[in-house]
Design a protein with these regions (language model features):
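Long, charge-patterned amphipathic alpha-helical coiled-coil/hairpin "stalk" segments used as oligomerization
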Residues: 99-206
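Conserved beta-strand segments of the P-loop GTPase G domain that flank and frequently precede/overlap
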Residues: 53, 82, 175-177, 198, ...
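Short amphipathic alpha-helical/adjacent loop interface patches that line ligand
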Residues: 66, 153, 226
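Residue-level signature of catalytic and energy-coupling elements of molecular machines
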Residues: 25, 81, 173, 225
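Short beta->alpha junction loops/turns
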Residues: 58, 84-85, 178, 201, ...
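Intrinsically disordered, compositionally biased charged tails
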Residues: 1-15, 235-281
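N-terminal cationic and glycine-rich segments that engage phosphates or anionic surfaces
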Residues: 12-78, 84-85, 89-132, 143-146, ...
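Short glycine/threonine-rich loop/turn motifs
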Residues: 184-187, 191-243
């Protein structure tokens, strides 16, 4: 039994080993002349003018980040994934959708976090257009108006469709390439929202709360890291569902206990009254 439990624990929250990280090319950094000295603790060596990332540190940091993201997902909160670079877009869209998390893969809308109410208004506009289409109001408009609204809807969908369900500020950001997404990182820093990120040797890790030192340019590297964190978050979501299913049963037991207690009290009161009557006689 203990062996089975250990195996199950190993199956859960599994992070890639050194060989898997190596195979995905997570160790390739940038040219030495492009490096950011703040990344020095995560650099293993320099080879042919290119910095090589220490994959043992990558594995440790990835495990730490995955555990923290699992807890966020388990508490029912949202993590916003941000990746507007070509090689990361589709992977991020697929992985975030699979765990029902919001994401931004087109241009980052300035003020997305710091001016969140305005962004919500734009999302509401999109919802209103959908309502118009359903209730027939849209059909009563002129051809020109319909065309304008359709174009507006398509534009909003492209930039905000993936965050339509984000009703409040996210509890964390997961960023691929902090240099490219520096505006998103700055907004999160300003609001005290934790930032998880894949950080390459040319980037500044100081504005990131959970640094995952890794190659943020190769699609295989991006996919492996995302697979790991999304699998951990999926576990957190499943655990939350399981706990919610158990909660009503516990609640029923708690309700039953006071009833039993009340019965005992009534019985004791009745016995006291009977004894009092006997002594009076």
């Amino acid at each position: 039994l203990l062996e089975d439990e250990c195996k199950q624990k190993k199956k859960k929250m599994s992070t890639p080993n050194f060989e898997q990280l190596l195979e995905a090319g997570c160790h390739f950094g940038h040219l030495k002349r492009k490096w950011n000295p703040a990344m020095a603790p995560y650099i293993f060596m320099e080879r042919n003018g290119i910095h090589i990332i220490d994959l043992y540190k990558t594995a440790a940091k990835l495990e730490e980040a995955a555990a923290a993201l699992k807890n966020i997902a388990k508490s029912g909160k949202k993590v916003l994934f941000v990746a507007t670079k070509k090689q990361a877009k589709q992977v991020v869209a697929d992985k975030a959708t699979s765990i029902n998390m919001p994401y931004v893969i087109e241009r980052w809308p300035g003020g997305m976090l710091t001016n969140f109410p305005t962004i919500r208004k734009a999302v509401k506009k999109m919802t209103n257009i959908d309502k118009m289409t359903k209730d027939g109001t849209f059909d009563n408009l002129s051809k020109r108006e319909r065309l304008q609204i359709t174009r507006q809807r398509a534009k909003l969908e492209k930039t905000l469709g993936s965050i339509a369900d984000l009703n409040r500020l996210p509890s964390a950001l997961f960023v691929i390439d902090v240099m490219k997404e520096h505006i998103a990182v700055a907004e999160a820093n300003r609001l005290g929202i934790p930032v998880f990120a894949m950080v390459d040797t040319n980037s500044n890790p100081n504005n990131v709360d959970f640094v995952i030192p890794a190659n943020d340019d190769a699609s295989k590297s991006i996919e492996l890291i995302l697979d790991t964190v999304c699998a951990a978050m999926a576990e957190g979501i499943e655990e939350r569902k399981a706990e919610k299913a158990d909660a009503p049963a516990e609640g029923e037991e708690k309700d039953a206990a006071p009833k039993r207690e009340r019965r005992r009290v009534r019985k004791a009161d009745a016995e006291v009254e009977a004894a009092a009557e006997e002594s009076a006689e």
